[in-house]
Each structure stands twice: as structure tokens, then as C-alpha cells.
Amino acid sequence: MTGAPPYNPQSPTQQSRYPVYSPPAKSRPYYANNEQYQQHPPQTPPAFSSRSPHFSHAPSPLPGTLPPLNGAAPPSSHPSEPPSQYQAHSSAGNPQFALPRPYPGSVLSGNGASPYGHSTPSHAHPAGRPDSHPQTSPKKESESQFPMSTHGVMGYPSSVVREPRASSPPKDVKPTRAADPMSFASILSGPTEERAPPPRQSSAEATPTPLAPAATAQTSLSPPPVASAATSQKSKDRAPALTASLPRLEKKPTTEKRRRNPPETEQKTADSRTSNVANGVSEPSKTLAQPRGAGSRPVMSERETEALNKALADMAEADKSDVEAPGYDRFREEYRAKGKKRAFATEQAEILRRKRRRNDFLVKLSKSLEKQATAGMDRFRYANEASVVAEVQAKEIQDEKERKKDMQRKRRRENTVRMEMQKKKEAEAKAHEAQDSAEKAKFLREAERAQRKIKTTKRALEGITAPEEISEVTPLAPNLEGGTTSSFHIGRGSPSRRKSGRGGPVTRPKKSKEQKQAEKDAAEAAYAAMENDEPLPIAPKEDPRKESLKKEVKGGRSKEPTPTPLSAYETKGYNQIYEQIWRDIARKDIPKVYRIKALSLSTRQENLRKTAQLASKQSRKWQERTNKSMKDTQARAKRTMREMMSFWKRNEREERDLRRLAEKQEIESAKKAEAEREANRQRRKLNFLISQTELYSHFIGRKIKGAEGDAAGDTAVEATGETVQPGKGQDHTIDMPSSVADAGTKVTNFEDLDFDAEDETALRQAAMANAQNAVQEAQDRARAFNSGQNQMDALDEGELNFQNPTSLGDIEISQPNMLTAKLKEYQLKGLNWLVNLYEQGINGILADEMGLGKTIQSISVMAYLAEVHNIWGPFLVIAPASTLHNWQQEITKFVPDIKVLPYWGSAKDRKILRKFWDRKHITYTKESEFHVLVTSYQLVVLDAQYFQKVKWQYMILDEAQAIKSSQSSRWKNLLGFHCRNRLLLTGTPIQNNMQELWALLHFIMPTLFDSHDEFSEWFSKDIESHAQSNTKLNEDQLRRLHMILKPFMLRRVKKHVQQELGDKVEKDIFCDLTYRQRAYYTNLRNRVSIMDLIEKAAVGDEADSTTLMNLVMQFRKVCNHPDLFERAETKSPFSTAYFAETASFVREGNNVDVRYSTRNLIEYPMPRLLCGAGGRVDVAGAENPHAGFRGRYLNHLMNIFTPENMKQSIQDDGAFSFLRFVDTSLGEAYEQSHLGIFERAVRRRGQVNRLSRLNVAYDDDKELAGSALPHTLFNIVDRNDKHAVNEVAAEGIMRDLMTVSQSTYEREGLNIIEPCVSPAASAPPISVVSSSHIPSIETRDTLFNVSVRHALYSTPSRQVDEQIIEKKVDPTPYSLAPMLPKPISAKGRYTHIEVPSMRRFVTDSGKLAKLDELLRELKAGGHRVLLYFQMTRMIDLMEEYLTYRNYKYCRLDGSTKLEDRRDTVADFQQRPEIFVFLLSTRAGGLGINLTAADTVIFYDSDWNPTIDSQAMDRAHRLGQTRQVTVYRLITRGTIEERIRKRALQKEEVQRVVITGGAAGGVDFNTRNRESRTKDIAMWLADDEQAELIEQKEKEALDRGEVFGAGKGGKKAAQKRKKDITLDDMYHEGEGNFDDASAKPSGAATPVSTAENVGTPSSTPAPKRGRGRGSGKGTSKRAKTTKERLRLIDGDGGLGPS
């Protein structure tokens, strides 16, 4: 099908600013030269309403004035006229194409430029029309307001669309080509040379190809050309086919087009279309042909012209109906049908695309709305989630509370039902048993009342709150209560088979087949309605609900509504929800409404009942009026009855109070009597124990006459020397027999004695019998031990005869010959006492004061046994680890014949050592492998199973205070050893309290000194209370105590037995807190509430006690040094610089070359020119000739210090004439004028002042004045200098007088330069960066000037000194002192690095400042010092101080290894240059001899005064020839003062017990406390707080309360007091010098390794093959009481009691 393509609404040369969009065909090629014609989407109104930018005039509305569509120019009036503006472009330019034009020519001006990029053929023949055109959307055609063109139908030319022609015009009217240039004849009048049309393209590949122009337009005056016959015939043959191939297309305008084109516009369009038709022939719209050039067309001849004219005339005269081809109407209808089909298909496709676009838009819109909804939900959740959660939680909590209340209420009601049931049964049983009818009726009424209560309670349990009488009304029973409304009944249905409760399973009713089918049909109908987007017909549920409710009411039970098929949307879930709603209503709402109605009904009935009662009262009022007198009588009787009742009640109350008071007094008197009886019983029990012990002591004392001889030198013996006289103090004494009683006396156990009897005769007899039995047991035990030894056969049996104690008095023991040393007199007496004890089988305590030779006395006993009795062992010596070497050395030294086996080391070593003695039947002789085994307490406990297998002849415990706790495993293990005798060596038998002495006595005599609480309390309570309260001690009790101790303990003090030993002077030095210490102390005190501490201390909680001890430790730290809390650190400003990174030091050699590479962050780049000589203004040279002006003229010609000028001035007696009197030449003056201040000072430093020596030669002022040289006349300062005189006076008073200014200058610290401020940041000088090497050289010379640095603070090194000697150079210039004084810190030097000042370190502590002054004096006096500390951290600080003062020292604490301790002590003893020995009080106070020192300083005191005594006795002992001075540093007004007072109280206890003296000389008016923790808490308070606490305590005592004590506080405190003491907690982790640990602690001396190895139990562990192993020990910070007890095993009872 052929036809013209649809026209475009715009001409290409009439392009608007915003061209109309028309999508190009997909197959159309792209042409680069058509870029200006490319179309884009429209953004403005249609382009036909815009004016073309290519024309300067409006388009003409006349169709005749339009230019030809083929692009040719309109007819010209003259051939010489230039081409018109409508002239088509040449073929070489833009090609010409056919224009689609849907708009009429009256609106758009035509132009031949085509928007397509196809070239046009160069011939003039019209080309064939394309079969098709690229399809565009039908909607694009609606953009035009004129759907029909005036030149054709649907945009096609009228020449190709056949219209019904009009009637034929008259024949005389013949149109010519001039008249009708667009006629068919005019078209056929073309050139003679025509080319065949190009082959037709397929519809898929066809492109719009325009027709070539037929001929050049001619004017109407020129004759038409004549065509040939052939040409005419050819045109005739082709015309029908052309017209026949064109269909007719008619299309009605759409609604949108009608809206755009009004009817009048359509009418105008139709008229315009009709006017273009003439003579029944449709006028062609335009000829789309491209004319060739004018010269290419041939000129017809005259003959050809005539023939053409003739043919044209024939054609004009002929009938034109013959041009219509047959079948044209059919083709037109087919074409229109196809057009309609295509339009419909396009419209459907557009609808589908529009639907897809709508769906896509709706999807995007839904996603956007979904996002908005999600965001809104998140915002709402974020804003309200917390409140909702809180609300839900609150609701749950409230529901839980209500549930608990309901459960409690239910339980109470169930209990009520159960009790009422019991009452009912009891009442029914009593009624059944009652004989009297009235009594039976009474019981029945009680049963009925109980039944009613049970019923009411059960109804309450079931949740029924309505009154009983309402619920009992049934439809069948009449309502007898009355009322204004009738009653109705809602009955209950039969109980359902399902379980009760909301959570039980619910059985749905079965449905019929019809119901199921109806539900299925309804579901299918609903699904189909949903698919068709139709509304669902949902039927309401009201009617079924009403019907079901009616059925429920009628039926009397609740039925579940069944789903009905009325709803089109009835599903299973819907029905379930619907039924669940109704079930909830039936379960919850209906009972609630019922209860409300029932309650309202009961309220109404109650009101009606009250109304009836009032009415009845009103009706009976007339009767009361007549009985008024009776009513008054009744009122008087009631009043009388009330008065009588009140009287009797008051009387009964008074009697009850009196009865209670009498009972209370009786109970109190009974308690008092019982207390008195118990006191008497305890007194008798105590008296029995003391009497028994006194008898034993008496028996032993009469045998041991040697102890009596010690009375001259032993104050304890003097105190206990008098015997007990009969008849004096009969309440506390018994008669001493002259001999031992009958051996057959019955022995009574302590538990079987009757202490309630008033007669004490039986108790005295029992005490005597028990004492005799104890003596006999000791004798039998010694005999039994000796019976197994062959060496004991030679003993005299009579000496062991306890029936004849007088024979012991004749024994006189001399010093053994085996002993190489010479015993002193008191030591020989001690040996005599020890031997007597051994021969009697009695254990003892040698308690000589420290330093009197307890060790040598013990060794002499072993030598005596070996020499006299041939007993060579085995002997067991147990001592602290620090004294093991001392024991081994002294035994080997004094008794070489006795072999010593040192038992210590690792487990493997000890296993090898046990081979020497681990035999059951070994015989010890002089040739045995060993005689004495020396070991430590820790190893004894570890290897207790092996020690228990051996029968030891003698066991000596050195420093026996290690077993002062009878509850420790160490005490129990040692007590279980098989040994004949035990000897305890201790210099301080009483350290903290009398309980420790009692533990020692209990150890040596377990059967006699049994662990009775009464005896131990008497031992400690009375004496300690005497020391605290300064009261008078019972002399009789003290005397009895001394008698008890006399046979078992021997103690001598130094001042009585050793006259040659120097005195010991103790001085307390009080120090004040510094500002920093006071701030720390106040801050600690403000943060602690003393009242809370005291209240907690009264309770006695272990955690509170630990907290209290921690506080005490913090306060003591403040007193010692504040740096124990926080050390001063090295500070430096922030350095803003680049630091060079060094290479790996591993790859370097021994010396690493570290150059100065620090650079500033700021660098100034400088050109090479400025750095060189040419860029300097003041440097003259070839590059800078003008720079020498300043040097030439200003520095030389104009300088007054030139030699020429000065010489002229001197000659003329000018300004420089003074140079001749100051010893200065012209050259020197010139040189000085050109030097700076620093250079002049450096040069003057090396000059020798010769003029000052004249003061030495001429000491007279007159001679000195006459000795002035003329050339030094003006050198007044140099001549008066006394430096040479000072050098002559090397020492003495003269030198001091001559150097007063210098000494003052140094003493005041004026020679010390300190920075005033420390910068926050520092940086090196800004460096200059240049390609020249001159800046680096100048920087190096400026920063590192050797001469300047040497002059300021440099000292000659060793290499310089060697070079001076080798080269023999004058050393004066190199040995001058630096110009700058010594910096404060040698490490920090003159930098901004602040190193902590040692002066500040010393002055920050008041103690350290006092110690600094004291050490200076002692150093000057030639003394040597033992410095004791409680904290090892303080020892660390003291090491820094001693290093700062250059004092030589050595250190020994718990971290020192055992093998190093011996060497350290030896160094101090042998090297006098060691000035100070730093020791820990607990570790360095035992077993070492430090007599080289004569001064002892306690930096901080110990809780236990005996610990300090042991420490100071390291120097004050045998071998000390000088006076020992003890200094104790105490901080005034702090806790240390109170600790010292408490230590003095403990010392008084020891003095009273041991010496027996009265309490005098010391003020003991201190606070008496039951709780030691409470006493320590008082130490933390100051005087004002202590006074306030005392006042509150006094008020509490007046009220009969215990101040600060809670419930069970006293019992808890007593219970914990037995477990651990406060002093143990304070010294937790410390050892007693016997540590073998090498790990230093942080706060105090640590626990020894041996103790930490294991935790031995009280019973010996069984043997485990190769040994027990070493295991891990407990930490020094163990928390439990059991671990602490194991940690301090044997150290219990060190608390500040």
C-alpha cells in the first residue's frame, strides 16, 4: 500500500524554541548533520502558535500565498529576480524531504526543509512514494487542533484521496496549466528525460522518501510546454494504478479532539477542504519534487510544444470519469477498516500501558506510604515504648499483688471453714452427749451458727457476693421479704462435662452437613467477590445473637451460638472469634451485671427493712411515754453498773501490776542469789586449781634448791621467795605439808568435783592428791623414757626418788669440761636449774632477758648430759630460720664433740638428711652420725610425721613466743612429739597478754596447767585490768601467781646480772605533721565517721574489723611519709618537635652514635642567595661591594677605640689617659671594645689576680698603701681582694671569718638557680632550610659552641685530663669551675624537665626531716645506726634518701634470702664504713647479733612493745661495751601517740607479773574497753571527738544500755575474738625473721615460704610415699579466718589488748 506519510505539525525551517516531541523510528539511522533538527519532548504549547525564528513576517492566511511544499521558490514575476527565501537548499547542503503537514496552510507557513537525513536524487523526476512510514502513537495526532487538512483526508494530499466529484463544468471552460498549475495536466508536463522510480522498499524497512519535483515553476504568462504522445500515454497508464493503490480513510474525531476543535472550527475546516476541489478533481496539496538546476533541463522544439499542447487540450476536453479505477470504493472501505483496526489496537496498547503505569505508580506510592508508616511507627515506639513497658510492668506487679491477696484471703477462708467444721462437729458431739434439752439446744445453735459461717465462707470462696437470702429466692418459692419490685431467678444449668476455668478445653458443638455446605458456599462466594473487586455481603449478627440469648434465658443454661449461613463471609476463624467474644461476655460481664443487680436489690431490701423498723418504733412510741419512770430507773441502773465495772477494772489492774512487780523482784533476787552461788562456785574452782598448782610448785620447789640460790640476782625469785604461812589468808591459801602425802590418796577428776559444797576440805584433799599424782606421773614418765635407753642404766635411782626431795639440795653442778667457753656466774646457776629440771622430768621456761646467753646455757645442758650421763642425744633444737646458722656455729664452736645436723633446704635435700635419723632403734653414742638436729618451726610442721617417729631426749624451742597460741597447729604438732623434756627459750614470756604465758605453761605441763577457762581468765583479767585502770592489785593473788611460776620459769635481767654491759637510754622524739601530711590526715578523718566505726566495732563483724585495720594502716602511712600514697613524678613540658627515629639497637655495636636531630615543626625555607655572602648586607665581598661601608667607616674610621685615636688621646691627656693607671695597653683596650660581655667574663675568669697577693706580703694598711704601683693605681677592686689571704688561712677560725660572705651565700641557697615557672610546651629554635650548607654550619656553631658550653657548665672529662698529662699542657684553663652553679637536679640539669626534688622529699615528712637532722649528728659523732621500720615500702623510700645523702647502708627484711642474711649481718659487723642498717621490725628483731651499732632508731613503733624490745636488744646485748641509745619517732597528735600509750600499758603488765612491783610511774588512766576493736576505733578520733564519745557512752551507761552494741554483738565479738586478733590483721603477711621467702611484699614483711608451702593440720598426716610435696601456699591477702589462722600460725594474740 502506497501513500504519503503522516505530516509533521511543524516545518523544519520553522522550528520553534521547544520543538514538538515525536519519537523516531527504531530503524532510522543517525545523522550528525541533523543535530539541529533532532526533536525533544515538548515543554511548551504547540509550536504552531509560535513564531518561526527564520521569518520576520507572519505567515499569510491565504492558501494561494503559501510557498510550494517541495521547497521551490514561488513563481517570480521576472526571471532575473534573485531566488526567494523559499528557495530550496542545494543538494550539497541539507537534503530536501517531503514534509508531513497535518495542519492547514492558513496556519503554518511551508518550507521545504525536511527533518530527515536522507539525500534527494539529483534528477527532476518524482521518486516513488514509500509504502509505509514509521508508526507513531495515535495519541500524537491529537496534538494538532486541526485533525483534517484542507488538502486531503487524515493528513494525506487531496490528489491521492478520491472524493465524490461534482458535476462536470461546461466544456467551454477548459482549465489551463497557467490557470490551474496544480492540475493533473500540469503535473504531467514535466521534462522529457525521466528516470524510472527506484525500487519499492518493504514496509518494515521503508523510510519516508519524498517525491522529486516534476518541473520548475513557471509564471502564468509563459506558454505551457508540449508533451509528447508517448509521455502522455505513459502518464495515462500509470495514473490509474497510482490512484487505485491509495485507500480512503475516514475517521471520526475522538472526544478529546472534539473538545479541542469546536464545531465552527470543524466547519471552517470542511469549507476549506471543499474549496480546494475544482471540476470534480481534487487539487493536489503540493508537489513534492526537487527541481534540478536551470541548465540541466533540455529545450523543447516547436513541434514538440504543439504536440504537447494538443495532447493537453484533448485531455482537457475528455471526460474525466474515465480516470476512476474500478473497485476504488472497495479498496477505500478496506483501508478504512484497517485504519480503524490499527487505531483500536493502538488504543488498547495505550490502555494497557496506562494501566501498567498506574499500577507501577500505585506500587511506588504504597511503598512510600509504607515507609512513612514504618517511620511513624518507629517514632511512636521510640517515644512511648518506655512508658508502655513501665505501665505494663506496673500492671503486672499490681496483678501479682492482687493474686497474692486473693490467695491469702482464700487460705484464711479455708482455715475458717476448717475451724468452723471442727467447731460444728464438737458442738454436735456435745449436743449428742448433752442430757439437758436447753444445753442441747445451745450446742445445736452453736452448730447451726458454725454451719452458717461455713456456708458464708464457702460462698465467699466461690466468689458469690450476693446475700444468701436473695440467691435462695426461686421462681417456685414465694418472696417473703417484701419490696416494691418482684424478684426473678437466673438459674444455673447443669454442670458441663468440660473442666472448669478459663484455661480448660472447650468442646465445640457438632455441625450438620447442611451447615457445613452452607459455610463452604459462603466462603467460595466471598472469594469470588474478592477476585472481582466486589463488596462482600456480610450479614449482621444481631438477630442470631438475640435468638441465642432468648434461648439461653429460656433454657436456663449458657449455650454457645452457632454460626449461621446468613453471612457471605462466615469462616471458621470469624466464627471462633465471634463465639469467643460471646463466651467472654457470658463469663465476665454477665456475672458482673448480675452481682451489681443483686447488690442493688439487697441494698434496697436493707433500706426497706430499716424503714420498717423505724415505722415499728414510731408505732410503739406511745408505750414509751407511759413508762418514762421505768426508763429513768433503767438508766440509773446502767450508769451504776458502768461505774462499778470501771472500779473493779481499775482495782484488778493495780493488783496485777503489784503482782508483776513482786514476781520481777523475786526473779531478780533469785538471779542475784544464783550469780552469787556461781561466783562462789567459780571461786572454789579457781582456788582448787591454784591450790593444786601451788602444791605441785611447792613439792618441786623443795626439791630444786638451786632455784633458791638465784634469789640474789633474780628479782622474780625475790618476789616469790617467801613461803605461804598457815593461818594467813585462809580463804586463798592452804597448809603446806612437810612431805608428800600418802601415795594411795584417791585422785579425783576435775569434772567429778562438787564445787557447790560450802566445806572446802574435800577440795583441798583432792588438790593435794592431784598434785601428788602429777608429780608421780612426771617421775613415771621420765623412768619410762629412760627404761628403753641403755645409756641411762648408770643413773642413780635415788636421785629420781621424789619421796626424798631434800637429796636434791646437795647436788652442785660444775661447768662441763666439754664446753670450751667460760660460763658466767648467773649462767652457771641457770645450768644448775636446767639440770635439776631435767633430772626431775620437769619442763621449764628459761626467760632470761635478751642478750644474757640463753643459747650457751642450753648448749651447756647438752654438754652436761653427754659428759656426765653419757646421753648423746638425740637433741632437737627448733629455732627461727634466721638463727639456724647461729645455732650451728655456736654448737660447733663451744662443743666440738657434739655433731650437728642442719635440717633445712628443699624437700629432696631433707629426704636425704632423714636417712641419718629416720631409724626406730638407733643408738646414739659419741661416734653417732649426729647428736643435735637443728631445724625451723616451718619445717617441723611440714615434716611432723617424720619427727614424731623419733624419741627425742631433749627438745629446745628457741624464741618460744612462736607457740604462744595454744589453738595453732604448730603448738599441737610440737606437743605431740615424743620427748623426755622440753625447754622453752624466750626473752619476752609476756608480749600482749597473760594468755600467752598461760599457753607456754600449758605446753610445758599439759596435765597440770590444763586449758581451763577460769584459770586462763584469772591469769589475764585481773592483772590486765589493774594495768589499765591503775587500781590496787590483790597482793595475795600476785604472790600466789609468783609461787606458781617459780619452779617452771627462770628470768634474769641485764642490769642485775651483767654489770659490764652498757646502759640503754630510750628517748621519744615527737615530730609534727607537715602541711601535706596534715591535709592528708584531715581528709582521711573527714571521710570516716568515728561514731559509725565505734558502733560497728561493738558488733564485732570481721569485715568491719578488717576495714578498721585498713584505716589504721592508712593513718600510719600518712604519719610516715605522704609519698606512700602518691610519689612525685618527673614532669616535662609538651615538646613540639620532630624526633629522629633510631635504628635497631640490636644491630648496633657497643656504642651508638646519637646526633642532635631534633627539629622544630616550623621551618623557614630560605633561598641560597640570602644564605650566602651575596645576600648579607654586613658581609663584604665580590658579590656585595657595598657591605663594607659599616665596617670601614663606622667600626674603624668613626670608632673612638681605635689604637690611633687612643694613642693620640693619651698624648694629649685626653679621655683615654686613665689607661696608664689601670694596667691596660692600647691593644687590650681595643680588643675589649670588640668583645661581648660573655667573652670578657670568660677571659677574666682565667686571669690570676696578682694584686691581691700584696695583702699577704704587706699586712699593714700603711705598708699596703705605700706599696701601690703607679700603673695599678686605679685597680682598687683587685688590690683590695682578700682571696689570696683566704688561701693562706686554710682552716680554723680565721678562714671562717674570711669566708663569711661565701658561706652565707651558699648556706642561704643563693647559689642555686631555680626556674620561676615551668612552661607548658617547649620547642627547639626554628630551623632554616636552604640548599646552602652555611645555615647548618652557623646553627651548629651557635647551639653547640664548645667554648661557651665549656665555660658555662662543663667539667673536664677523664680523656681531657689524660691528654693534658700526655701533652704537658697548662691545666689552668681546663680546670676552671663552671660559671653556672650546680643545678638543683643533676639528672634534670638546666632543662625544663622537673625531676622530683630530694629536698622536697625530705621536708614533706616531719619524721624524715627529724631523722635527717638526727643522722647528721650521729654521723658526725661516729655512731652506727640500726633503723627499724614496719613497712617495707618505707624502707624503699629510705634507700633513696640514704643514696641522696651518700650514707652507706645495708638492708635486711623479709624479702632477704636466708643465705644472704648471714652475709649481710657479717658485713655490717665487720665494715665500719657502713653507717645505717635498714631492718624490718618483725624480720630483723630476732636471733641476730648487731653489737657494732650503738644507736637504735624506730621510725614507727610496733603494736607489741616486746617486738621493739627484741629489736633494740640486737644491739644491747653481751659484747656491747658502749651505751645504747634508742630513739623512737612519734608524730604528735596522731594515732601513733595513742599506740605508744597502749604499748606502755603492756609493758606495765610484764613488769607487774615478772618483777612483782607496784604500778607506778606510768599513767594508766586510759579507757577501759571490753572490745579491743572499739578501743582502736577511739584512737582514730581526736580529743574533742573522744570527749564527745565518752559523754555519750556515759549517758548510755546511765540508761543501762551498751553504747554502740547491737543484738548479739557481744557474743559475736567474743566468738571472733578467739579466732583472730586485730594485730594479726595489721601484721598480716609479715614474718618473724624466719622467713625463707625472697619475694618482697608491698606493705610489710611477707610471710615465709615455708609457712606458705602448706597448711598442716593438728594431726600428723600419713606418709605418702616419697613425701608430701610442696604445694602452693596461701596468699598474704587470704580472706577467710581459717586461712588467716594458717597464715599466722603460732602468732596469735598479738592484738592491742
From Swiss-Prot:
Gene Ontology process terms (BP): CENP-A containing chromatin assembly; DNA repair; positive regulation of transcription by RNA polymerase II; regulation of TOR signaling; subtelomeric heterochromatin formation; telomere maintenance via recombination; transcription by RNA polymerase II
Keyword Lipid biosynthesis found: no
UniProt catalytic activity: ATP + H2O = ADP + phosphate + H(+)
Main EC class the enzyme belongs to: hydrolase
Span of domain DBINO: 581-706
GO MF annotation list: ATP binding; ATP hydrolysis activity; ATP-dependent chromatin remodeler activity; DNA binding; histone binding
E.C. number: 3.6.4.-
Keywords: Activator, ATP-binding, Coiled coil, DNA damage, DNA repair, DNA-binding, Hydrolase, Nucleotide-binding, Nucleus, Transcription, Transcription regulation
One GO CC annotation: chromosome, telomeric region
UniProt-annotated binding residues for ATP: D848, E849, M850, G851, L852, G853, K854, T855
Sequence segments annotated as region (Disordered): 1-324, 398-569, 615-637, 1626-1697
Coiled-coil ranges from the UniProt annotation: 383-466, 623-694
Entry superkingdom: Eukaryota
Entry function: ATPase component of the INO80 complex which remodels chromatin by shifting nucleosomes and is involved in DNA repair.
Entry's family note: Belongs to the SNF2/RAD54 helicase family.
Note on domains (UniProt): The DBINO region is involved in binding to DNA.
Identification of the protein by name: Chromatin-remodeling ATPase INO80
Record organism: Aspergillus niger (strain ATCC MYA-4892 / CBS 513.88 / FGSC A1513)
Gene label: ino80
